[in-house]
A protein has these predicted regions:
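C-terminal accessory helical subdomains adjacent to catalytic cores in phosphodiester-
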Residues: 2-12, 20-143
């Protein structure tokens, strides 16, 4: 996605444990783009509340991202329920379909997308991070 000199590029990690392996791909993409780059990791936190290994991995990723000065969007358990609040989706393949083509409607509680708690169900910090990135771009373009 490219607009007004800003470009959004998606790189799949193929699993949370591959976060360090992505560094080379990130650098390759950054070098192909002449503008300033902001890196955003998107992490699914479905098991951090119930699995100590997943919580440890999430904390490692969070520390790595802070060290690199990247941004982190977390998607908490059942995040798709924000976009489709009428029903709970149980089938994993259906969840993926809804996540890729979510339904935006007036029933969405945007406050649930402004959470700072990575363990609270049906929430994310996506609005906080995207607003922060938008402000960085606006500031950069004004100079």
């Amino acid at each position: 996605l490219k607009e007004n000199g800003n470009k959004l590029t998606f790189i799949s990690m193929n699993g949370k444990t591959n976060y360090i392996k992505m560094e080379r791909k990130i650098e390759e993409r950054k070098n192909k783009f002449s503008g300033n780059s902001k890196i955003i990791f998107v992490i699914d936190t479905d098991n951090v509340s119930s699995n100590s290994n997943d919580l440890k991995l999430f904390n490692e990723i969070e520390n790595y991202i802070k060290q690199k000065k990247y941004h982190l969007i977390f998607l908490n358990p059942d995040i798709e329920r924000i976009f489709i609040p009428e029903k709970k989706i149980k089938n994993k393949s259906d969840k993926k379909i809804y996540a890729r083509h979510f339904i935006w409607n007036d029933k969405i509680n945007l406050n649930k997308l402004k959470s700072k708690d990575y363990s609270k169900n049906n929430t994310s910090n996506i609005c906080i991070i995207l607003e922060k990135i938008k402000n960085i771009i606006i500031l950069r373009n004004n100079f």
